[in-house]
Amino acid sequence: MIPDVSQALAWLEKHPQALKGIQRGLERETLRVNADGTLATTGHPEALGSALTHKWITTDFAEALLEFITPVDGDIQHMLTFMRDLHRYTARKLGDERMWPLSMPCYIAEGQDIELAQYGTSNTGRFKTLYREGLKNRYGALMQTISGVHYNFSLPMAFWQAKCGVTEGEAAKEKISAGYFRLIRNYYRFGWVIPYLFGASPAICSSFLQGKPTTLPFEKTDCGMYYLPYATSLRLSDLGYTNKSQSNLGITFNDLHEYVAGLKRAIKTPSEEYARIGVEKDGKRLQINSNVLQIENELYAPIRPKRVTRSGESPSDALLRGGIEYIEVRSLDINPFSPIGVDEQQVRFLDLFMVWCVLADAPEMSSDELLCTRTNWSRVILEGRKPGLTLGIGCETAQFPLPKVGKDLFRDLKRVAQTLDSIHGGEEYQKVCDELVACFDNPELTFSARILRSMIDEGIGGTGKAFGEAYRNLLREEPLEILQEEEFIAERDASVRRQQEIEAADTEPFAAWLAKHA
């Protein structure tokens, strides 16, 4: 089932320097909660500056949903320490609030209790909040409070020069984009390994279902927790952060222009379902528009091709201008065993897996095959640790035992690990392979099995409160290592100033501005 990567691995072993200079970045979302686990109702803390313009600390869907962002970094330890500093400083500024350490929220009774993220009075700020109003009206506010970690990854130019002979210009843009699309296609085919190893949402609180019927065969504990005994990541299931209405958009990952055309089509395609919501009611705007996607960011995807946008530029226009610059991996649950929601083992694994995905042959995929890959993901998400579980290839009928496929993959990853270790010295990447490959013979070592044991004993609420309290105390006591308090204060003040400048520069009424952007 695993493609034959032996030739590409042999090439890599002859060109180890091609991997020198991998760049990464991390984003982590987390809900602010009170000591009893309920959602904080306070505004975004003033000490953290403006959520609209702060470089490192912002908000996602809700006013209480923090998002931490590291700068692009070539050093894993430095990146993780930077992320930890963001958590340390924030923990000191939250008063009695703490950061929820799980992907799935628990103590939220009603979607109406969730205040949308606020970004001030500028047209840009109001647009961001209106987009969130649309998400709430389309999918419900509760789904939008599910948290995750995003891992951004790019290969150095030296890799593309050695592998594809690229120089500069239009040809380089096309070849590099083609390489990243190969990575993405392999991710759709084999990325289920991420929830298998690191999924950490095998259960949900009963309040999350809100009385809605479900066909999933949940088991229920006395305290009202619903779980699937072999599940890995309900966050990635249809119960979690997905969008069924997008499954027939026909967006493919074979060619830059095709991909962008599909995305632009979805933004312009009217939706009967969303038209029923209405765009405006009693003078209040309910969504940006009633198209399948309000804006490009609404496209749900476990992985995204990205390029840093210029002012006023859409993500797809940035891709057309310069090609794919980096990849955003979006399938990581919050790691409940780390105070910052992600750890070094995960980052090193993702490095290895991304390199493997770009090396392995990946035939082009139709939108039908893309939908078929969902079958493997769904199996792993809902019953990944089940003994005897098998996986298929695309839409074919042949089945393969998951543990065998996983171990075959890790044989390749071990060779990538040896190459990366030869550049950096030490055996850190190989150690990660040795630790993680054991999860295929013993699923009890996976994140989902470990956290489920705690949840069955303590409930999701009890587990979340205990971990959150421990991490709050730990982070508040740890000294800052990279950033200094003065730098946080300077960025707070600068972000507030930037927001004020944006607001002062706005001369156009929001309705007129929106007419041009909706």
Swiss-Prot record:
Alphabetized UniProt keyword annotations: ATP-binding, Glutathione biosynthesis, Ligase, Nucleotide-binding
InterPro entries in the record, alphabetically? Gln_synth/guanido_kin_cat_dom, Glu_cys_ligase, Glut_cys_ligase
Recorded hits in Pfam families, A to Z, give: Glu_cys_ligase
Q: List GO BP terms, alphabetically.
A: glutathione biosynthetic process
Q: In which pathway does it act?
A: Sulfur metabolism; glutathione biosynthesis; glutathione from L-cysteine and L-glutamate: step 1/2
State one molecular function term (GO): metal ion binding
Give me the reactions it catalyses.
Answer: L-cysteine + L-glutamate + ATP = gamma-L-glutamyl-L-cysteine + ADP + phosphate + H(+)
Q: What class of enzyme is it?
A: ligase
Give any Gene Ontology cellular component.
Answer: cytosol
Q: Give EC number(s), comma-separated.
A: 6.3.2.2
Supply the HAMAP family for this chain.
Glu_cys_ligase (MF_00578)
State the similarity comment.
Belongs to the glutamate--cysteine ligase type 1 family. Type 1 subfamily.
Q: What is this protein called?
A: Glutamate--cysteine ligase
Q: Which organism is it from?
A: Salmonella gallinarum (strain 287/91 / NCTC 13346)
